[in-house]
Amino acid sequence: MKNIHMKTRFSIFVMLALTCQILVAQTHIKVNDSNTWTTDELAPYVNQEVIFDVPIIVSSNASSPYTVSTRRLFTPTNQAAPNTTAIKTVTSLNSKGAMQLSGLNKELRCGDKIYNLKARVNSTTSLTYLDGPCTNSRAYYDTVNVRRLVNIADCDTCLLVCTSNLENYFMGNNYHSRQRAKVINALKHIDADLLGFVELECGDAAIKEIVSYLNSNLPHRTYTYISDNTTASGTDTKAAFVYDKNVLKTYGDMMVITGGAGKARKAMQIFEQKRNGERFIYSVNHFKAKSGTGTGADADQHDGQGQFNATRCQEAQAVIDLYKRLVGQREDKDILIMGDLNAYAKEDPIRKFLEYGLIDLHRSFHADTSYSYQYGGLAGYLDHAICSPTMYKQVCGVIGFHVNSDENDRYTYDKSSDQTMFRYSDHDPVLVGLRLDGSAATYDPKPEINNLEIIRGNASHLVIRDAESTDEQISYYAIYDISGRPVVSATKIESNMESVNLPDASGVYILYVYYKAKVYPYKFIVP
């Protein structure tokens, strides 16, 4: 056996494959890949007790029974482009991978893993809990129900940018004091240098209140906001900017895009970092929702993108057009586009940004695993962080802070007197760390690895060595075929000797390892 030698600190080499199993009395059901396992395999065990020795993951916790699976279930258009074979595969695997688990008298968050689950199989899609499981966490959760925020801007020169959908923050809300307490507790915990909001009441009253409470709760901050001269009107909401004026200053006036949904839901502002004079464009947006009844091109095309997709595409183009105009005027290409775009990662509006040459930071840093929103037991990200190639070189991290989407909605301000930050909105805030002097630890979107060497022999899987995840940086691997179709979706690297089963079908494949904010591709052949 011979190692692949890389310039990085981890290596990939070939070993014999292992399999996961479900234990049923003395009978084993082999689960070679949790990402493709289907509930059809439970058919022989209906009315029997089983013990799962693969972790079972909670996909929906809105009510009992919980929806669970051997994998995290994602919205199809978050993982694959509309009208493709790949999206049909994701849709099929979602429907065949979900089970209903009843009888579990324990509050779990979406994404929680249940180890050693003992259950009665009522049908191929229905289980009844029989024995106490041991839960363990994905990000921001552990066995004592603590959600942690990873610091992605941990240097003196870094900026932390946070964009959040505030889920209709209105001064006249009957539960406003509860909502305000939850929002302020969350923003206080995040402690960002620059904040962008959507679903905030038009006018100055709501944004002024948030700034006042933040300054009272964070004495080291001196936040201020940008007035847009709007007035409160019914249910109208806007995009808004809040920044620490000791850290940043505005350069020029705020620019509002009035087309599409709402009059003030898309805005751009150039900011300058005071310590070094570096500038960048910050774009905060709230695109047209998928709900409602569209007509013509805005009608539901039944491709997974919902209503008003054409309008969202027009909104994306309007953002690009304003950016192009600013580049022509200011000669600065650095832009960070954020907000609730009401489009998942592979949908047409996001494709417009990528085809223009911009970069999806969620995808770059976290492969296929990012999410900011849950709907119908499926995760995905409507809340984006997209940037130009010049900005990309200055990004030192991006995360969705899962303080909302994974939570049971009984914590919402209108259903509970709870005033913690948990479930302050239905969307997770998205955080981006920036180092505007250009020295951020980022990577080329298409890097090359030299000095690779491998002897395959008859081996049936790869091993990724020394790239295990840490609390500060989660590592993943994914496998794609030569046409770009995902074969193994992004999987967290849990150990320093991570086993990766090779695909069954012959062909050429690409293994991507996402490690320490870099991505490393490795091409291999299954004979």
Each predicted region: which residue ranges?
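N-terminal, active-site-proximal structural segment of metallo-dependent hydrolase catalytic domains
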Residues: T125-T237, T295-Q305, T311-D321, D332-D334, ...
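C-terminal outer-membrane/trafficking sorting elements
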Residues: P445-P527
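Extended non-catalytic accessory segments flanking core domains
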Residues: A25-S164, N168-A181, H189, S216, ...
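Bacterial Sec-dependent N-terminal signal peptides
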Residues: M1-T27
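Catalytic metal-binding/acid-base residues of hydrolase active sites
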Residues: E167, E201, K288, L341-Y344
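Active-site His/acidic residue clusters
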Residues: R275-E278, V284-N309
